[in-house]
Amino acid sequence: EQCGDDVCGAGHCCSEYPPMHCKRVGQLYDLCMASKATKNSGNHLFFCPCDEGMYCDMNSWSCQKRTA
């Protein structure tokens, strides 16, 4: 799926969902960014969990290794 300027795939940590999806998932709502954080799609960015020891780099929209 398109996410920001990138496509959500292997190693990536975000994808776009409509605002109603964010509301439906309830407890995951806090993982959905405000719609203004996306392009002009009106969708919210939803951040998938990264592997252990990784974090989501919102600049590159990818999972990066944590540095000590």
Swiss-Prot record:
The keyword Disulfide bond applies. Keywords: Disulfide bond, Secreted. Its main location: secreted. Gene3D superfamilies: Lipase, subunit A. The keyword Zinc does not apply. It is found in: Secreted. Expressed by the venom gland. GO terms for cellular component: extracellular region. Disulfide bonds join 3-14, 8-22, 13-48, 32-56, 50-63. Negative results: is not toxic to insects or mammals. Has no effect on smooth muscle contractility. Also lacks both agonist and antagonist activity at human prokineticin receptor 1 and 2 (PROKR1 and PROKR2). May not be involved in prey digestion. Belongs to the MIT-like AcTx family. This is U1-hexatoxin-Hv1a. It comes from Hadronyche versuta.
